[in-house]
Amino acid sequence: MKNLLKLLLLVLAVYLGLAVTVFNNPEVRQKCAAVDVIVKDSDVAGFITPLEIRTILKDSKLYPVGQKMSNINCAEIEKVLARNPFIDNITSYKTAGDHVYVTVTQRLPVMRIISDNGDNYYIDTRGKVMPHMHYSADLVVATGHISKQYAHSKLLPIGRLLKYDKFWDNQIEQINVDSAGNVELFPRIGDHVVYIGQPVRVTQKLKRLKAFYAQVLNQVGWNKYSRIDIEYDNQIICKK
């Protein structure tokens, strides 16, 4: 009889211990009620949407809603989303309540490449290739004889320069590369082509071009010349 009483007391103690554990740790019994998805930089990039994030998680059987909070693996969520070529960084965490937060930072393109060899892709701020997909943002387009190595070593610095300068970001809409690797710029304002030659000392060349715009074209008109050559230092050659 004493042994039975001891056994009952032991079972009761274990039960009470588990009950206290569950009570003090609501995650064990609580289920996820909502997933809050935040996609940063949506105003300047539109490669991925919150709906697409949710779809990826559902297809991977990782969608948290309805799952016990204790069973939700945020590290696995981040791992799966990191495979998407348009995502740069992911942070996922559980709240003290019943929500899961997923914050995604998109890769930001600086240029679209449409090469004569058939390549069609974007390059991001780090110079990494991004596959061509639906995207409507106003980016400079580079055309012509462009290999991936040329795009990374020569065009990426130009793309960054244009992207982070408000004037040039608004002014230049296309870059063309000829078979010798020489570069032409096509502006939005002005009926002319800007020839810069080999893509070296581009910062200095654009500085001279900007001064020429202000001091000359503002006086004679932006459609005065059909070609503006800024290849060589200390001179600008114009053709009507």
Predicted ranges, named:
Residues 1-67:
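N-terminal membrane-targeting segments
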